Swiss-Prot record:
This is Glutamate receptor 1.3. Belongs to the glutamate-gated ion channel (TC 1.A.10.1) family. The keyword Secreted does not apply. Glutamate-gated receptor that probably acts as a non-selective cation channel. May be involved in light-signal transduction and calcium homeostasis via the regulation of calcium influx into cells. The keyword Cytoplasm does not apply. CDD domains: GluR_Plant, PBP1_GABAb_receptor_plant. One of its GO terms (molecular function) is glutamate receptor activity. Pfam families: ANF_receptor, Lig_chan, SBP_bac_3. Residues 1-27 form the signal peptide. One of its GO terms (cellular component) is plasma membrane. PANTHER family: IONOTROPIC GLUTAMATE RECEPTOR.
Length: 860
C-alpha cells in the first residue's frame, strides 16, 4: 500500500512537471508568435558576381553575419533580409539588377559596386532613388565623391601611396617601374600613387600594362624591355589572375634574383587568395607587399571557424576568408544596427544617416565611417617567404614604419626582409647598366624642306650621317642629362608623319623615338607618346610688307573722312550764323565770310581758331565740337601709330592665292576655315619656295605653323611680316614608343629649357627672329558706325543751337511780323531781317538796300 502511494505521488509529480513544461512551452510559443508579428522586415539588395571567388565570399559573409547578429540580438524588433541578384560581372546588368530590386523588392539599401563603373552607376541610381548604395572594395576615385548616397568600404589609397613612397625613400631608391593592369579600376587607383611619386622625387622610369588576355609571350617581351632598360625596382598593381603569369615569367628572365625589388600594392595583396599554385608562390620569393591590416581577435577566430564549418564540399575554395569578406561582415552588422535604430520611436533619421553614425568593434577593427567611407588606413608589410606570408612591420598613420603594431616610431624600424634571391641585404635599387651607356634608336625626318628646323645629310667622305637643325639641338639638350648613346636613323618615306608614328608603334624592335618637325596630333597620340611641345603653338600668316605713301589716310574709312569734313564745315557755318550780327570778325564781303567759315571750322582740328566769340550759343557749339575733335584725333593718332608698326593682311577671295606646305594636314585644316575657304591655294615645298612665291606675287600670303614661318622670317627679315592667328595646333614634339620611360623626363627637361630662356636662345640662333617681324593683325581702320553715337550728339547739339537762334530772331521782331501783315508780307519781312543780320550795313550790299526800301514802301 505504501509502495502504491509512493508510485501515485511520483506519477502525480511527473504529470505536474509535464503540465508545467507544456504550459511554459505554450506560453513561450505564444510570446514568440506575438513578437514575430511585431518584427519589421528591412529588405537589402545584394548585387554580386556569383561566378567569382570574391562574389561567393561576400554572399556567404553577409548571410552568416546577419544570422549571427540576430542570434545574439534576439530581442531586436527588426530583421534585415537579403535579396540576391547575380550581375555576372557586367556593370549594366548590375545596374539593371539594382533597378529590379528597387521596383520589385522595395529594398532600402543595396550592397554591390565592386568595380569603378559599377560604383558610378549605382551611385547615380542612389542619387535618383535616395537609397544607400554600399560599394565593397571599389577603387579609390575622386569622381565617386559627388555621390551623397554612396558608401565605400575600401582601403585608404592616400595612406597607402604615402606608405609605399616612404618605403622607397627609406631604402634610397630614386626610380621605379610601374607594372599595372590595363583596366579602368587599376589605372584609376594607380594615379594617386604616381602623383605621390612625383611629389617626393621618385622617378617613374617606365610603365608597363597587362590585361587578363595578355599572352605569355607578350608578358615576356615587355618584361624583357624593362630588363634591357636596367630596371631593378618594380611596383606591381594588378590582380591575382595576372600575377600568376607575371612572376613565373619574371623568374625565367632572371628578374627575381639578387638586386631586384618587387613591391605589391594593397589592392594587389588584398586580392590574393590561397588558391595560388605553389609554382607562383615560389616565383614570388622575396616580394614585399602592403596589405590592409585586420587585427587578430577572438571574434575573428570564431567567425573563421564557423565559416569553414558552414562551407559545403563544392565550395572548398572559399576556405580562407578574404578582406572583402571581413568588410562585408562589418557592413552587414552596421546595416542591422542602423535598421533597428530607425524603427525606434521618436527617431526621424534615415537609414543612410544611421549607418554613417554607427560605430562598433567589428572583425576589421574599429568600424567607423568617415565622409561615407570605411577607409582602412592600417597596413601591414608582408614579405613572401616560400609559400607563406611573413609580417615584417606596420605602416603608421604618420607614414613611418615599425615592427610592432602599437609602437609609434619615426625610425622606420622593420623586421629583416628577405629579398628576391634570398639575400637579407637591401638592394641598391640602381640600374644594372648605369655604368654602360644605353642605346637610343631615333628616327629623324630627312625631307630637308626646312633645313633650319631639320637637316639630314650624309658625309660623302666618311659616309657618316650628319643631323643638324633647331629640332635636333633641342633634342640633344633634353636628353643630355641621361646616359644614352643615340643612333640616328633617317626616315626616308616622305613627309607623311602619320606613317612615321605608325612605324614607331609597330616596329618597337627597331625604333625607340622620332625627332623632327613633327606636330602633336590626337591621331598620332593613339600610337605613340609625345613629349611637351618645344615650339610655339598655333598657325601664322606671312605676307610681304607694304610700303604705301598714303598710309596716313588708312586709320579712317572713307565715309568717316567725308562725315568729319562735313561737320568741320557745318561747325563754321553755325558759328558764323550766330556771331555774324554782332561780331565784326565774321563780317565782310562774301569771299571774306566764306573764308572765315572754312578757316574757323577746320582750325578747330588743331585748336588754332583765334576769333573771339561773343555769343554763348556759339561757345556752346564750339565746346561740343572741340570735344568731338579731341576724340577723333586721339583715335586717329592711336590707329595710325598701330598701322605704322603693325602690318595688315587684306583678304580678297576672288583674286588672291594662299600658299601652304604641300602635303601638310595642318595647313589643309587651316584652309578650310571660314575666312580662307573660298580662296585658291597653292602648295609649296620649302622656305625658299615661300619667299619666291611671295616676292613675285604668285601668292598673296602663306599659311603654316609658326616654326616654319619663323624660318622664312629669319631668312628674309626685311621683306616679310607675320601675323599670328589662333593657337589651333599643338606645336612640335618628340615621339616615343608608348610607355617609354624617357617621355616624362624629356618633357621635364624641355620645361627647364623654356624657363631658363635657353630654348629662346636656340630659336634666335636658328631663326634670327625678332619681335618686330611677328605682329598681331589687330589694327583695323575706324569706321563711321563705331562713332555714330558721337555724331548723333553733335548733330542734336547743332540743331538745338540753330533752333535757339531762330527763336531769338523771331522774339526780337515778333511785333513787327504780326502787326497788320499778311502771310506773304511776314515771310518777306523775315527775309529782310535775316539779310540785315548777315549784312548789318546796307551800303555793303545793294540787294539788301533794295529790300529795305521795298519794305518801307509797303508799310506806307
Amino acid at each position: 500500500m505504501e509502495r502504491f502511494c509512493i508510485q501515485t505521488q511520483t506519477l502525480l509529480s511527473f504529470l505536474l512537471v509535464l503540465l508545467l513544461f507544456i504550459s511554459r512551452s505554450f506560453a513561450s510559443t505564444k510570446n514568440d508568435d506575438v513578437d514575430g508579428g511585431k518584427r519589421v522586415q528591412i529588405r537589402v539588395g545584394l548585387v554580386l558576381d556569383l561566378g567569382s571567388l570574391k562574389g561567393k565570399i561576400v554572399k556567404n559573409s553577409v548571410s552568416m553575419a546577419l544570422s549571427y547578429f540576430y542570434a545574439i540580438h534576439n530581442d531586436y524588433k527588426t530583421r534585415v533580409s537579403v535579396s540576391l541578384r547575380n550581375s555576372h560581372g557586367e556593370p549594366l546588368l548590375a545596374l539593371a539588377s539594382a533597378v529590379d530590386l528597387l521596383k520589385t523588392e522595395g529594398v532600402e539599401a543595396i550592397i554591390g559596386g565592386n568595380s569603378l563603373l559599377e560604383a558610378k552607376l549605382l551611385g547615380e541610381l542612389g542619387e535618383k532613388a535616395r537609397v544607400p548604395m554600399i560599394s565593397l572594395d571599389s577603387p579609390f576615385s575622386l569622381s565617386l565623391s559627388k555621390y551623397t548616397h554612396l558608401i565605400q568600404a575600401t582601403h585608404d589609397s592616400t595612406s597607402e601611396a604615402k606608405g609605399i613612397t616612404s618605403f622607397i625613400n627609406v631604402f634610397d631608391w630614386n626610380s621605379v617601374a610601374l607594372v599595372y593592369e590595363d583596366h579602368d579600376d587599376w589605372r584609376e587607383s594607380m594615379q594617386l600613387l604616381v602623383e605621390h611619386f612625383h611629389e617626393n622625387g621618385v622617378r617613374v622610369q617606365s610603365k608597363v600594362g597587362f590585361t587578363v588576355s595578355s599572352s605569355e609571350d607578350f608578358v615576356m617581351g615587355r618584361l624583357q624591355q624593362l630588363k634591357d632598360l636596367g630596371t631593378t625596382v618594380f611596383v606591381v598593381h594588378l590582380s591575382e589572375v595576372i600575377a600568376t603569369h607575371l612572376f613565373p615569367c619574371a623568374r625565367r628572365l632572371g628578374l627575381m634574383g639578387d638586386g631586384f625589388v618587387w613591391i605589391l600594392t594593397a589592392k594587389t595583396m588584398n586580392s590574393f587568395h590561397e588558391n595560388i599554385d605553389d609554382f607562383t608562390k615560389q616565383a614570388m620569393e622575396g616580394v614585399v607587399g602592403f596589405k590592409s591590416y585586420i587585427p587578430m581577435s577572438i571574434e575573428l577566430q570564431n567567425f573563421t571557424l564557423r565559416w569553414r564549418k558552414s562551407l559545403p564540399v563544392e565550395e572548398a575554395e572559399l576556405t580562407r576568408l578574404s578582406i572583402s569578406g571581413i568588410w562585408a561582415h562589418d557592413i552587414a552588422f552596421a546595416l542591422a544596427r542602423a535598421a533597428e535604430v530607425i524603427r525606434m520611436p521618436n527617431v526621424t533619421s534615415t537609414l543612410l544617416e544611421e549607418i554613417t553614425k554607427t560605430r562598433f568593434n567589428g572583425l576589421s577593427g574599429d568600424f567607423q565611417l568617415n565622409d561615407k567611407k570605411l577607409l582602412s588606413n592600417k597596413f601591414e608589410i608582408i614579405n613572401m617567404i616560400g609559400s607563406s606570408e611573413r609580417r615584417v612591420g606596420f605602416l603608421n598613420s604618420n607614414g613611418s614604419f615599425s615592427n610592432r603594431r602599437h609602437l609609434s616610431s619615426t625610425h622606420n624600424k622593420l623586421e629583416t626582409i628577405i629579398w628576391p634571391g634570398g639575400s637579407a641585404q637591401s638592394p641598391k635599387g640602381t640600374s644594372l647598366i648605369d655604368s654602360d651607356r644605353k642605346k637610343l634608336r631615333v628616327l629623324v625626318t630627312s625631307s630637308n624642306r626646312f633645313p633650319r628646323l631639320m637637316k639630314v645629310e650624309t658625309d660623302p667622305v666618311t659616309n657618316e650621317l650628319i643631323v643638324e637643325g633647331f629640332c635636333i639641338e633641342v633634342f640633344r639638350a633634353s636628353i643630355s642629362p641621361f646616359n644614352y648613346e643615340v643612333e640616328y636613323i633617317p626616315w626616308l618615306n616622305g613627309s607623311n608623319y602619320d606613317n612615321l608614328a605608325y612605324a614607331l608603334h609597330s616596329q618597337k624592335d627597331k625604333y625607340d623615338a622620332a625627332v623632327g618637325d613633327i606636330t602633336i596630333t590626337s591621331n598620332r597620340s593613339t600610337y605613340v607618346d609625345f613629349t611637351l611641345p618645344f615650339t610655339e603653338m598655333g598657325l601664322g600668316i606671312v605676307a610681304v610688307k607694304e610700303r604705301s605713301m598714303w598710309v596716313f589716310f588708312q586709320p579712317l574709312t572713307p565715309d568717316l573722312w567725308i562725315t568729319s569734313a562735313f561737320f568741320f564745315v557745318l561747325t563754321g557755318v553755325i558759328v558764323w550764323l550766330i556771331e555774324r550780327a554782332e561780331n565784326k570778325e565774321f563780317q565782310g564781303s562774301w569771299p571774306q565770310q566764306i573764308g572765315v567759315v572754312l578757316w574757323f571750322g577746320f582750325s578747330t582740328l588743331v585748336y588754332a581758331h583765334r576769333e573771339k566769340l561773343k555769343h554763348n550759343l556759339s561757345r556752346f557749339v564750339v565746346t561740343v565740337w572741340v570735344f568731338a575733335v579731341l576724340i577723333l584725333t586721339a583715335s586717329y593718332t592711336a590707329t595710325l601709330t598701330s598701322m605704322m608698326t603693325v602690318q595688315q593682311i587684306r583678304f580678297n577671295s576672288n583674286e588672291d592665292y594662299v600658299g601652304h606646305l604641300s602635303g601638310s594636314l595642318i595647313a589643309n585644316v587651316a584652309l578650310t576655315s571660314s575666312s580662307l575657304r573660298a580662296m585658291r591655294s597653292l602648295g609649296l615645298n620649302s622656305a625658299a619656295d615661300y619667299a619666291q612665291a611671295l616676292l613675285n606675287k604668285t601668292v598673296s600670303f602663306v599659311v603654316d605653323e609658326l616654326p616654319y614661318l619663323k624660318v622664312v622670317l629669319g631668312e628674309n627679315p626685311t621683306h616679310f611680316f607675320m601675323v599670328k592667328t589662333q593657337s589651333t595646333t599643338n606645336g612640335f614634339g618628340f615621339m616615343f614608343q608608348k610607355g617609354f620611360e624617357l617621355v616624362p623626363n624629356v618633357s621635364r627637361e624641355i620645361s627647364k629649357l623654356r624657363t631658363s630662356e635657353k630654348l629662346n636662345e636656340m630659336e634666335k640662333r636658328w631663326f634670327d627672329n625678332q619681335l618686330p617681324y611677328t605682329t598681331d593683325d589687330t589694327s583695323n581702320p575706324i569706321t563711321l558706325y563705331r562713332f555714330r553715337g558721337l555724331f548723333i550728339i553733335i548733330g542734336v547739339s547743332f540743331a538745338f543751337a540753330l533752333a535757339v537762334l531762330v527763336i531769338l530772331c523771331l522774339r526780337d521782331k515778333w511785333e513787327i511780323l504780326v502787326d497788320n501783315l499778311d502771310l506773304s508780307q511776314r515771310l518777306r519781312h523775315f527775309r529782310i531781317h535775316f539779310v540785315r543780320s548777315i549784312h548789318t550795313s546796307p551800303l555793303d550790299d545793294p540787294i539788301g538796300e533794295t529790300a529795305v526800301q521795298m519794305a518801307q514802301q509797303n508799310r506806307q
